[in-house]
Amino acid sequence: MGIFNKVTKTFQWGDQTVVMETGEIARQASGAVLVSIDDTVVLATVVASRSIKPGQDFFPLTVDYIEKTYAAGKIPGSFFKREAKPSEHETLTSRLIDRPLRPLFPQGFFNEVHLVIHTLSLNPEVDADIAALIASSAALALSGIPFNGPIGAARVGYIQGEYRLNPGPTARKSSQLDLVVAGTEAAVLMVESEAQQLSEEIMLGAVVFGHQQGKVAIDAIHELVHAAGKPVWQWEAPARDEALIARVAALADDKLRAAYQIRNKQARTEACRAAYAAVLAQLQADGVECDTVKAEGLLFDIEAGIVRSQILAGEPRIDGRDTRTVRPIEIRAGVLPRAHGSALFTRGETQALAVATLGTERDAQRIDALAGEYDDRFMLHYNMPPFATGEVGRMGSTKRREIGHGRLAKRALVAVLPTKEEFPYTMRVVSEITESNGSSSMASVCGGCLSLMDAGVPMKAHVAGIAMGLIKDGNRFAVLTDILGDEDHLGDMDFKVAGTTAGITALQMDIKIQGITREIMQVALAQAKEARMHILGKMQQAIGQAKTEVSNFAPKLYTMKINAEKIRDVIGKGGAVIRALTEETGCQINIEEDGTITIAATDAAKADIAKRRIEQITAEIEIGKIYEGPVTKLLDFGALINLLPGKDGLLHISQIAHERVERVSDYLSEGQIVRVKVMEADERGRVKLSMKVLAERPAPGSDRFGTGSERPAPGSDRPALAEREPRREMRDHGHPPSEQQQQQSPPADTGSGQRVG
């Protein structure tokens, strides 16, 4: 008998085969499950502390999602050649896993829980995040840790009018929707989505479809737990001290009710702090044995009860609004004189200063993802310093919350951005939250859209975002439009919806209770649409459409197309040609594999110079066309004439003049500018020229230098020539011609040119 007690559960999920295993790997953890979906393999482990840290007053859940580069057969590209700090994708996936799991731990459970998920193998067409959600749910369910799960999860696409289960990256390219939903058997817990302006009905249908498909995974997890689950912890919620609760309520109720009559956030916060301090002082004076953490927890419950009961009773909200009213909005565009685009968006006590910057293709962010590298030409970064909430705090590295809010705002705007062909710029938006009292991420959506329009980005439509809240008690509920920070803190849901007049572009839902129903989501989406239309009207009044020209401080981009076979000519040996061209013009020049060239310059004249130079470098020599160029080299049997940058032709000795030429140097000298006509080119691209066809045949006894180009006197100065690219000497021009060949008449001028090659 082996040392492992391995249990395996296999089930079919749409077109995919899912295998869940436990009992072989990570046996020291409280729970460990290995999930395989068509060669994507994820290991989820969970460990929980058996004791609570002194003074702990919140649930300390930590989720770490880690991608190993060996999963895709790669070695890390860093100096140390090992995985370092989490990537943005890893951080976002950690949040994606955390959000549906956190509400399922019981109230009062403050033991530390650490969930670690490793991606061990990756099939590029099977996303690891869904496998990670299922593995995490299964690991918690069989660990014995107090947990009201399991949950199921699914990704939903919308392709050609049909919902698709777990579409891979390739399929999603043709999908109008990328939605991830997670929930229990009874209700939805989390939604994260990006959409191409879809209706509320389609979005709600996608959530319901995904929730139903997730139940397949829940059933399989139940079977795995039945076969391999560990004993459930003997944990009970701390006993309620009814006498203390009554005493605290008697001391605090009137004070907190009075505080919540104050409309201003800062004044209200100070009043609540004063109430807390007064109650704690009175308890101490009365000799009541109660630690501060416990007393503050009771005070928070009283706060929540006051706010929630008032809203459910139909009374005005904290700031005096009803459930459907959006706070006053003020918009000012172009607030920063030298920024490429900017907008100050203020909604009540929430304010975002959004700044847009335009760059070239070289400014795009290079993403070294596990599934492969790619360039991202649109970035949105969200920053919220402590002063935005009137607090003192440390400024350090970007926090998970800031990364998540930035990605949500980015998702909302992607659907209306112009294509690279329509607008070849790289775009970056930075949302600086200067005030925050609820829904700062949605303020970033509004401000970000306006700043891009101010920068001259041809957006397809305006995009606005709104955050919806929920107060639920039994069968009674109230959906709140444009929630405040306190309503988010004391309520049951944060449901963010962004979109245009045509439909939804992004949706995110976070739940604090164990699920919401279809009815609640339907009401929330309807109210969100009403609020979105109101905000869009305000935005359109501020900026009706994008500026037709980019800022004078932004680089101007000019595109041109060349034959892909000519790319090497523009680049030159070792990059010499393009480097010299860049230094000469001061422009940035980017060349794509298909021959598309983008020239970036702040000076249009310099861009024109660069464009003309590239046209000269890539131009084809045409048969029958007349060129003017310098003599680059004298040969015994003729001369090399530069026709175009890097392109020479052979002027044979017999084609210099009508009379017999004994020595080329009697007629030509290096550097002399001559006019020649292209007569022919052979299969190897060698070009033959003629001077004499451009000159009239001289009358008997006339000057022998009647060739259309006066021969310079030996040693005379010649006009200075513009710097040119290094010449390439033509080879295999043949042997000196015979006397009969020298006397042969040239071919007649055909007039119109014919391109060589």
Swiss-Prot record:
Its EC number is 2.7.7.8. It catalyses: RNA(n+1) + phosphate = RNA(n) + a ribonucleoside 5'-diphosphate. It comes from Verminephrobacter eiseniae (strain EF01-2). Residues 555-614 form the KH domain. One of its GO terms (molecular function) is polyribonucleotide nucleotidyltransferase activity. Keywords: Cytoplasm, Magnesium, Metal-binding, Nucleotidyltransferase, RNA-binding, Transferase. Residues 624-692 form the S1 motif domain. This is Polyribonucleotide nucleotidyltransferase. PROSITE patterns: KH_TYPE_1 (PS50084), S1 (PS50126). SUPFAM superfamilies: Eukaryotic type KH-domain (KH-domain type I), Nucleic acid-binding proteins, Polynucleotide phosphorylase/guanosine pentaphosphate synthase (PNPase/GPSI), domain 3, Ribonuclease PH domain 2-like, Ribosomal protein S5 domain 2-like. It is found in: Cytoplasm.
